[in-house]
A protein has these predicted regions:
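Intrinsically disordered, low-complexity, positively charged segments
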Residues: 12-33, 329-348
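Short, conserved phosphate-binding/catalytic loop or strand-edge motifs used
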Residues: 106-110, 146-153
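A generic structural motif
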Residues: 60-62, 114-120, 506
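Domain-level signature for soluble enzymes in the chorismate/prephenate branch of the shikimate pathway
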Residues: 317-532
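Positively charged, Gly/Ser-enriched RNA/tRNA-binding surfaces
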Residues: 7-25, 36-37, 69-82, 89-139, ...
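Long, charged alpha-helical interface segments
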Residues: 151-242, 477, 486-488, 510-531
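Polyanion/phosphate-binding surface patch
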Residues: 34-64, 414
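Glycine-rich, N-terminal phosphate-binding loop and its surrounding beta-alpha-beta segment
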Residues: 52-101, 375, 380-389
Length: 532
């Protein structure tokens, strides 16, 4: 009797296919309990996707947690013998905060781990299985590959202080060139060193194009060894079926990952569906001398594949349309005029219509007209490929997007302001009125000051006048509103301007279109600056 799996949901079909793939590769199924000692996660917080964990006290008084991660538990309990390679696969649920609902969510994962004696053969097998896993999911896919050894080697060659490396890698991962150079300067690097780091941004694309440049940029043996491994892996994956891209800005946590890192994307899904890498540094916390490599497939992301296409995408076109989230208002008008001037205009005047979607198929462009505070949300969740958003909104939302360009438009600054006669009283918390709650918390935490937050949505300047707060945290452009209400700027702590952002998955499939738009946009902004 044959069982027809076509009636199953995409993630159910995938679980059958992946199980067969991993067992054929010699992997044994690993089953773990639902709970784990909280101390394991507390000691390895930076390895987790979020530090938020569901905890409870067991009947014997132990503090336990619903597992937010599987790899940590396997690494802790595997204990491979010397010269032994353990191969496990798993199908488990983990419990993490959801970006959509802002509540904890049960997330289905399948994954594979190789632990113990992990050499070149095991690494090749693991990455090959990652590519085969994407192939089993039945959609066009991209596997993005990088190497922590290459990044560490460059940081060593540039004598970058250990304390500054994590911040620099964070800017690289976000493709945030403008802030990368600022962070490099803050780390004491000279202009040549900052330019060398910035050069990693260009090492992104097809293996044929990027690998020779990766090899040419090597400065020491560590970088050369990493480049050689990347070459071997790309040769291994030459006939994999999807698209293999090198991106030397991709990085994992410094204290855990030491070799290859990779992410897999499916067309039409807004986030990576596969993540993995070599994590010897984590494994050696539990088994000295052991190595490890593995990856996880996020099955719940596949639920989107069974959803109907949104109306805006139902009219198929042979061309690739770039979907732009455009903020309504003065900033949006400035941005649109700039884009229209470089060939991305629409025949329809969006200010003369109540339509929220305007497009120009001849220019391969489609605009979504959205509230400025929602731009980052549309882009992060893949409804739009790119968008223009203020740095204030981007920081407040902590959006997981690529920040590709500082346009310099809409310049202002985030400030602490207070009545003219205000004096800080360190004996009590500062009462802060703001609509930028996360930004305010982060700033005051950085200076070690206790605060009480009062969230407001408008007329923030009124709060200290009425005694509702001591100070406000808000955007200041000219300062006129502050002065007319008897307030003064106490501290300026964050410059703000409009940023060009991109969805990370869209960038894998529409990078040519995005790069072309970026190149034209940079040229237009430079020409505009010269005219001043």
């Amino acid at each position: 009797m044959k069982f027809d799996i076509s009636c199953l949901q995409p993630k159910e079909q995938a679980s059958f296919a992946l199980r067969a793939l991993y067992e054929a590769a010699g992997c044994r199924k690993y089953h773990m309990g639902r709970f784990e000692e909280y101390g394991l996660y507390q000691e390895n917080r930076s390895f987790l996707s979020s530090e938020q964990v569901i905890t409870f006290t067991d009947l014997d008084g132990r503090l336990l947690a619903l597992k937010p991660d599987v790899t940590l538990s396997i690494a802790k309990t595997a204990q491979p013998a010397p010269d032994e390679t353990l191969r496990y696969y798993y199908h488990e649920n983990v419990y993490r905060p959801s970006a959509e609902s802002h509540t904890f969510k049960e997330i289905g994962q399948m994954g594979l781990e190789m632990l113990g004696d992990v050499g070149e053969g095991q690494v090749r097998q693991a990455v090959s299985l990652a590519a085969q896993s994407l192939e089993q999911l039945g959609q066009p896919w991209v596997l993005e590959v990088s190497h922590m050894g290459y990044l560490f080697g460059l940081l060593d060659a540039l004598d970058v202080p250990e304390a500054s490396r994590a911040a620099l890698l964070a800017k690289l991962k976000a493709k945030n060139l403008h802030e990368l150079k600022a962070a490099a300067s803050a780390a004491g690097m000279d202009e040549a060193g900052a330019d060398a780091l910035a050069g990693l941004m260009s090492l992104c694309g097809s293996c044929e194009d990027v690998l020779p440049r990766v090899e040419a940029a090597c400065r020491n043996e560590r970088m050369e060894a990493a480049a050689a491994e990347l070459k071997a892996i790309t040769e291994e994956l030459a006939g994999a079926g999807g698209s293999i891209r090198l991106d030397m800005t991709l990085a994992g946590e410094m204290e855990y990952y030491n070799g290859l890192v990779f992410q897999g994307y499916l067309e039409s899904l807004p986030r990576p569906v596969l993540k993995g890498g070599r994590y010897d540094l984590l494994m050696q916390k539990f088994t000295p001398g052991a190595g490890a490599i593995g990856f996880a497939v996020y099955l719940d992301e596949l639920d989107r594949l069974s959803a109907p296409l949104p109306p805006v995408q139902q009219q198929k076109t042979e061309k690739t349309m770039l979907n732009v989230a455009l903020p309504r208002g003065r900033l949006g008008d400035k941005v649109y005029d700039l884009l229209a001037g470089i060939g991305y205009g629409c025949p329809e005047d969006y200010n003369a219509t109540r339509k929220l979607v305007v497009e120009n198929p001849a220019a391969d462009i489609r605009y979504f007209l959205v509230k400025p505070s929602d731009v980052a949300i549309y882009v992060e969740h893949g409804a739009a490929d790119v968008g223009i958003v203020g740095k204030d909104i981007l920081t407040e939302a902590s959006a997981d997007v690529y920040e590709l360009l500082d346009t310099g438009l809409g310049k202002c600054r985030m400030c602490v302001a207070a009545p003219a006669d205000y004096k800080d009283d360190p004996s009590r918390p500062v009462r802060v009125a703001t609509k930028f709650v996360n930004i305010a918390k982060s700033y005051y935490a950085s200076i070690g000051r206790d605060i009480d937050i009062i969230k407001l949505n408008g007329s923030i300047e009124l709060a200290p006048i009425l005694g509702l707060s001591d100070v406000i945290v808000d955007i200041v452009e000219t300062g006129t509103t502050l002065r007319e209400n008897g307030l003064r700027v106490v501290t300026e702590f964050m410059p703000i301007s409009a940023r060009f952002i991109a969805n990370k998955a869209s960038y894998q499939f529409k990078h040519r279109e995005m790069d072309e738009m970026l190149e034209k946009l940079r040229a237009a902004l430079a020409a505009k600056e010269e005219k001043k």
